[in-house]
C-alpha cells in the first residue's frame, strides 16, 4: 500500500509525517488518555517516567516505522527553560537506552558580536553548554550562530571551555540566503564529523545542484517579478512562511528574483485597490473569519478586470468564487455561510460532516474529495 500522506521538508530530501511534529500538548494528551484507559494500572502519572517515556516512544516510532538509518530530532526552545526540561530529560534517557555511540548531540548556541568592544563573546555559549551538562547532556558538536567569522582562537576557546573537539566547533554565520548555510557547513566538514560520531559509512555528497540553486538565488538571470500577498495576518509574516518559501522556490525554478510585498486586506477594504497596481501577480492565502474578507473580494475583482495573474488558496479561492458569483453570475448578495449565515446565495457552505464539529484544533478535512 502507498505510504500515508506526508510533506517534504523544506531544504531536505526527506519525508515528514504528522508524527514528526511533537508538541507538549499532544504528549500530555496522549498520557492522560492512556491513564484514563487504565494503561498505567492506577499509577500516579508523573513527568518521569510517563511523560518522558511518551516522548522517547515517539522518537523511536519514527525509526521503527520507516526503517531509516538516522532519526533527526530537534528540541526547540532555550536550555534552562522549564518547558523544554521533559524533552531534554527524555533525550538524555534515550541516549542511554540506545547507547551513546549510536547518537550524536548537536547544540546550537549564540556567539554575539559586541560592537562597542569590537569582539565576539563566548560566555553565552559557555553558560548554555554548562546548563545542558547539568541536565546530563554533553554536546558532541557545537553550531555557533554569529554575525562575524569565528577566528581560530575563538573556536579553540569555545572547544576548551565546552569540552568539545575544535573540529566540532562549527561556525554558522549570517548569510544572504539560508540556502547557502549547508554549503558553509560542508566547507567545515560538519557532515563528516556527524558520520564519524555515528560510525557510519557514506559516499561523498554531490552538492553541485545545490550550488547552482544558490547561485540562481543570489544572481537570478531573468530579472525580477513583484508579487503581492493580500492576507489577514500580514503583520506577522511567519504566518505565511510556507507560501513565502513556495514563491521563492518558484523563482528559483524560473531563474527570477521574487520580490514579495505583504498587503493587509483590511487596508484594501478601507483604502481601495490602488495599492495593487505595481504587482505582476497577486496571491490571496487562507484564513478564518469575516475580518478583511471584503477587501479580498475587492482585490479579486480588480485582478480579474485588469487581467493580473491571481492565485487563491483556501479562503483566497472562496473569495474568488464569491466575487465571480456576485459580479459575473449576477447572484446579488452571494457569500459564504461562514461570514453571512443568512445570505440568499450561499455559494460557499460548511460541509455537512463538519456541522456538529465544535473543537477548533485538528478538525479540518484534508483532501478526499
What does each of the following model-derived ranges do?
Residues 119-120, 367-369:
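A short glycine-threonine-serine/GTX helix/turn-capping micro-motif
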Residues 4, 8-259, 266-281, 288-289, ...:
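Flexible phosphate-sensing "switch/lid" loops adjacent to ATP/NTP-binding sites
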Residues 105, 261, 339-341:
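Beta-strand segments within the central parallel beta-sheet cores of soluble alpha/beta enzyme folds
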Amino acid at each position: 500500500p502507498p505510504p500515508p500522506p506526508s510533506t517534504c521538508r523544506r531544504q531536505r530530501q526527506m519525508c515528514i509525517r504528522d508524527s514528526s511534529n511533537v508538541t507538549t500538548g499532544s504528549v500530555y494528551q496522549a498520557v492522560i488518555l492512556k491513564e484514563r484507559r487504565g494503561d498505567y494500572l492506577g499509577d500516579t502519572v508523573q513527568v518521569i517516567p510517563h511523560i518522558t517515556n511518551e516522548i522517547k516512544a515517539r522518537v523511536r516510532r519514527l525509526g521503527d516505522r520507516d526503517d531509516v538509518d538516522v532519526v533527526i530530532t530537534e528540541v526547540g526552545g532555550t536550555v534552562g527553560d522549564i518547558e523544554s526540561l521533559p524533552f531534554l530529560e527524555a533525550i538524555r534517557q534515550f541516549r542511554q537506552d540506545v547507547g551513546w555511540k549510536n547518537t550524536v548531540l548537536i547544540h546550537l548556541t549564540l556567539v554575539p558580536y559586541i560592537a562597542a568592544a569590537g569582539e565576539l563573546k563566548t560566555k553565552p555559549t559557555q553558560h548554555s553548554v554548562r546548563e545542558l551538562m547539568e541536565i546530563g547532556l554533553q554536546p558532541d558538536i557545537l553550531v555557533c550562530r554569529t554575525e562575524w567569522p569565528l577566528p581560530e582562537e575563538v573556536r579553540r576557546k569555545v572547544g576548551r571551555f565546552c569540552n568539545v573537539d575544535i573540529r566540532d566547533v562549527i561556525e554558522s554565520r549570517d548569510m544572504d540566503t539560508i540556502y547557502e548555510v549547508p554549503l558553509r557547513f560542508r566547507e567545515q566538514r560538519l557532515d563528516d564529523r556527524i558520520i564519524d560520531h555515528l560510525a557510519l559509512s557514506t559516499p561523498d555528497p554531490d552538492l553541485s545542484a545545490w550550488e547552482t540553486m544558490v547561485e540562481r538565488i543570489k544572481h537570478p538571470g531573468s530579472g525580477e517579478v513583484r508579487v503581492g500577498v493580500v492576507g489577514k495576518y500580514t503583520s506577522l509574516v511567519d504566518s505565511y512562511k510556507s507560501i513565502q518559501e513556495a514563491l521563492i522556490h518558484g523563482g528559483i525554478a524560473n531563474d527570477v528574483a521574487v520580490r514579495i510585498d505583504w498587503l493587509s486586506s483590511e487596508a484594501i477594504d478601507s483604502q481601495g485597490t490602488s495599492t495593487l497596481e505595481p504587482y505582476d501577480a497577486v496571491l490571496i492565502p487562507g484564513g478564518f473569519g469575516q475580518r478583511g474578507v471584503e477587501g479580498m473580494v475587492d482585490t479579486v475583482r480588480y485582478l480579474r478586470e485588469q487581467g493580473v495573474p491571481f492565485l487563491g488558496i483556501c479562503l483566497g479561492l472562496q473569495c474568488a468564487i464569491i466575487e465571480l458569483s456576485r459580479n459575473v453570475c449576477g447572484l446579488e448578495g452571494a457569500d459564504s455561510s461562514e461570514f453571512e449565515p443568512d445570505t440568499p446565495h450561499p455559494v460557499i457552505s460548511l460541509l455537512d460532516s463538519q456541522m456538529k464539529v465544535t473543537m477548533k484544533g485538528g478538525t479540518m478535512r484534508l483532501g478526499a474529495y
